[in-house]
């Protein structure tokens, strides 16, 4: 079923094609039909649908009947567009986010309709053949969006600074990043009700951190009562982000629940970015990182203490670093990986990744291959599991490694933190930032050649590795 927008698109494409067949310029057709050239441009771009009398005038000038002009039937050249529009494929592509306006798309389709529609349909078919769910498609698009901006978003940073300024002006005190202050903002400014008991009544939701319930009089935030203070602060900061930036389209549950549009996925990211930027303010972090990079020796304990000083989770801390480094340090050749692992299990899964500015050697694999067991991000999970046998509350732990890729020759300096995935039982996660060890990195990070840091030959997966004497190999190549 074609909606109004698609009908406008079809009419505009048909009008443009008929005009070109008559070898008329837009200015000539507009004058002959008694309409302005700007109005004609709006019609051809699919933004406007003309009144009946205007259609009569256009049809007369172009030498076609009124019925032919308004018919949704297209000639052979343009017919693939109908299939494309009816498939809703364009709705699955977040084109506007990437600066591809409807007018540009219409122009592309009009110039090569069969090729463009076939290309877009192929993208959709590939995603279906690989059983890529719609939300996975949205997440892939989101990663591309982050890469375009080096994972730094000035407009959100400015929103955070403005929020803190308004807080200080209204209350006469600086925002102190405490759990109580975050709760009070939601309770008093945005009239929320925060319920920490409801989720515990449903065992199947014990791993869900929060749910948003929109009500006419008062929004309700259901918080998992098993969350620690650090996790609660992030969820509250995220809710403030939604409200302060007026992000209306949202997924009511956690990010892994199915999103019905790319805008929901994007807004979830924006709210999370806001929370990270609020809890880890930009200027103190830049100062801390400058001091860290000046040291000639790596100090893991000092790195953990830096993280703890912000009272945030390892993932929030490491992800925030990936936002600051490209913009303020010029270190934009990096990757971020999050692995999860069930205790007493040798299966390791990448659940989040980001590559700046392009894919690096360690990356997700959809073929169920076995990731290289020499990666620090996997070894640190093994180490944490061993520590948890002695102490269930062990962690977080931090480790570093220089990883030299056998085939590409690329070398990465990797910093990894592992912790228990509280409140999810019996699961651990590790987050890793890997820096391409180019001249720029070595000039800015003094401890890159600390002799105490291990250098290991690594590869991507066991199945693709040519090493024959690898003790860590879990399957044959």
Model-based region annotation:
Residues 9-10, 17, 27, 31, ...:
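Short juxta-domain linker segments that transition from a proline/glycine-rich
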């Amino acid at each position: 079923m074609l909606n109004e927008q698609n009908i406008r698109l079809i009419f505009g494409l048909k009008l443009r094609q008929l005009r070109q067949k008559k070898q008329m310029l837009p200015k000539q057709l507009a004058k002959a039909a008694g309409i302005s050239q700007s109005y004609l441009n709006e019609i051809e771009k699919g933004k406007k649908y003309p009144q009946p009398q205007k259609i009569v005038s256009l049809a007369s000038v172009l030498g076609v009947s009124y019925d032919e002009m308004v018919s949704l039937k297209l000639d052979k050249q343009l017919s693939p567009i109908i299939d494309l529009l009816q498939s809703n494929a364009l709705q699955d592509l977040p084109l506007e986010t990437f600066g591809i306006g409807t007018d540009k798309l219409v122009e592309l389709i009009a110039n090569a309709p069969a090729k463009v529609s076939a290309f877009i349909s192929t993208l959709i078919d590939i995603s279906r053949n690989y059983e890529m769910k719609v939300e996975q498609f949205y997440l892939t698009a989101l990663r591309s969006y982050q890469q375009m901006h080096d994972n730094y978003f000035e407009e959100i940073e400015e929103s955070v600074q403005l929020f803190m300024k308004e807080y200080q002006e209204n209350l006469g005190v600086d925002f102190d990043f405490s759990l109580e202050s975050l709760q009070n903002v939601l309770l008093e400014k945005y009239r929320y009700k925060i319920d920490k008991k409801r989720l515990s009544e449903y065992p199947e939701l014990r791993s869900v951190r929060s749910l948003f319930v929109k009500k006419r009089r008062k929004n309700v935030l259901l918080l998992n009562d098993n969350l620690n203070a650090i996790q609660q602060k992030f969820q509250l900061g995220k809710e403030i982000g939604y409200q302060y930036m007026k992000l209306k389209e949202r997924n009511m549950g956690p990010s892994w629940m199915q999103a019905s549009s790319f805008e929901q996925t994007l807004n979830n990211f924006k709210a999370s970015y806001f929370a990270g930027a609020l809890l880890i303010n930009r200027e103190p972090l830049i100062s801390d990182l400058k001091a860290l990079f000046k040291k000639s020796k790596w100090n893991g304990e000092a790195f953990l203490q830096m993280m703890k000083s912000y009272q945030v989770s390892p993932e929030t801390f490491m992800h925030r670093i990936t936002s600051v480094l490209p913009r303020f340090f010029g270190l934009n050749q990096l990757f971020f990986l999050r692995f999860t692992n069930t205790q007493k299990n040798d299966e390791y899964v990448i659940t989040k990744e980001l590559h700046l500015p392009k894919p690096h050697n360690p990356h997700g694999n959809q073929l169920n291959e076995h990731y290289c067991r020499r990666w620090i991000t996997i070894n640190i999970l093994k180490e944490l599991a061993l520590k948890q046998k002695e102490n269930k509350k062990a962690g977080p732990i931090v480790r570093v490694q220089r990883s030299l890729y056998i085939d590409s020759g690329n070398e990465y300096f990797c910093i990894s933190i592992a912790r228990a995935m509280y409140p999810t039982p019996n699961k651990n996660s590790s987050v890793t930032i890997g820096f391409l060890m180019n001249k720029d990195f070595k000039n800015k990070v003094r401890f890159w050649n600390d002799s105490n840091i291990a250098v290991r030959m690594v590869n991507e997966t066991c199945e693709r590795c040519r090493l024959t004497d690898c003790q860590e190999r879990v399957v044959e190549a």
